Structures are given as structure tokens and as C-alpha cells.
Amino acid sequence: MAATAPKAGGSAPEAAASAEAPLQYSLLLQYLVGDKRQPRLLEPGSLGGIPSPAKSEEQKMIERAMESCAFKAALACVGGFVLGGAFGVFTAGIDTNVGFDPKDPYRTPTAREVLKDMGQRGMSYAKNFAIVGAMFSCTECLVESYRGKSDWKNSVISGCITGGAIGFRAGLKAGVIGCGGFAAFSAAIDYYLR
């Protein structure tokens, strides 16, 4: 941006102001996008949003509690329990062998027997889903806290740890397969959701 020469008959202050305008513009650019740019705290009120007061100590304490690994694990445990129970009841509902007595195959099961089997299967699925959800969520939170990053590697590492821990109950080979399978599943879900 070259400064234009002052017109004939123009005053000296006008010529100086026109020469300084590009200079002020370039200084402004340095503060906005250049080397002198600094991080700014953007308040919602300055952006046209609703201004919010500063957070109280109670609000900060509640936020810290809700961001803790224990809370995340408990939330995943409860969510897994509910989802697992619903999944167990659903699968028991479509299973044709619910309430089936192998001693008397021609007898029709009563509603009480069918509901009892559905409840048992729902509770079994609920417990398993709750344990897996709590283990995965807690492990992912701990890995994220240790690494200091929130990326796809956290879910893969925690998936491997969770799958390996579940699989090691059946032996070393099952633990390695569980580690790889759960890590691959976690990576696929993380890739699909992000």
C-alpha cells in the first residue's frame, strides 16, 4: 500500500494524515493477526450474547466433581445398567426358548415363567454392561488425565486395557484377543463419531 502524494493546494496536516493511515492500518493488523496478537477473554455480553456473572465457588466445585473420573465412571455404570437391562429384556422377548422346560418340551410356559426368565436375562445383561461401561469410562478418563490430551488414542488405549482385563479371566490368549478387539471397536466408534 503506497501512500499517495498530497494534492497541490492541500494542507500539510492532511498530507500527514493520509500518509499515516496505511501505517495505522498495518499496526492494527499486527495486533489482530500478526505477531503482536494476544489471547483475549471473550465475554458472551461483548459478542451479543447474554452476559453471565462470574462463577461462584459452589459452581466451580460442582463442575470439578462432574468432570472427575469417579463421576464419569458412575454415570457410565448407571447408563450401562439401564441400557443392558433394556437390551437383555429385548433379546429375551424375541428368544423362542424363554420359559422352555427341556423336561417337558410340549408344555407351554406360563406368563410368570416367561417374565421371570426375561428379568433374569435383563439383570444379567445390565450387570455386564454396567461393569464394562464403568471400566471403559474410568480407564479412558485416567488415560486422558495422564496424557493431557483428548484424542482418539485415549479410547484405543482404554479399549485395549478394558478388553484385556475382561479377557484375561479366560486366559492369556483371550486377554490379547479382547485387547485387540475392544481397541479396534473403540477406534471405529471414535472415528465414526468424530
Swiss-Prot record:
It is found in: Mitochondrion inner membrane. One of its GO terms (molecular function) is mitochondrion targeting sequence binding. It comes from the Eukaryota. It is a multi-pass membrane protein. Disulfide bonds promote efficient assembly of the TIM22 complex. InterPro entries: TIM22. The chain crosses the membrane at residues 74-94, 123-143, 170-190. Keywords: Disulfide bond, Membrane, Mitochondrion, Mitochondrion inner membrane, Protein transport, Translocation, Transmembrane, Transmembrane helix, Transport. GO terms for cellular component: TIM22 mitochondrial import inner membrane insertion complex. Disulfide bonds join 69-141, 160-179. One of its GO terms (biological process) is protein insertion into mitochondrial inner membrane. Belongs to the Tim17/Tim22/Tim23 family. Component of the TIM22 complex, whose core is composed of TIMM22, associated with peripheral protein FXC1/TIMM10B and the 70 kDa heterohexamer. In most cases, the 70 kDa complex is composed of TIMM9 and TIMM10 (TIMM10A or TIMM10B). A small fraction of the 70 kDa complex is composed of TIMM8 (TIMM8A/DDP1 or TIMM8B/DDP2) and TIMM13. The TIM22 complex also contains AGK and TIMM29. Interacts directly with TIMM9, TIMM10A and FXC1/TIMM10B. Interacts (when oxidized) with TIMM29; interaction is direct. Essential core component of the TIM22 complex, a complex that mediates the import and insertion of multi-pass transmembrane proteins into the mitochondrial inner membrane. In the TIM22 complex, it constitutes the voltage-activated and signal-gated channel. Forms a twin-pore translocase that uses the membrane potential as external driving force in 2 voltage-dependent steps. This is Mitochondrial import inner membrane translocase subunit Tim22. It comes from Bos taurus.
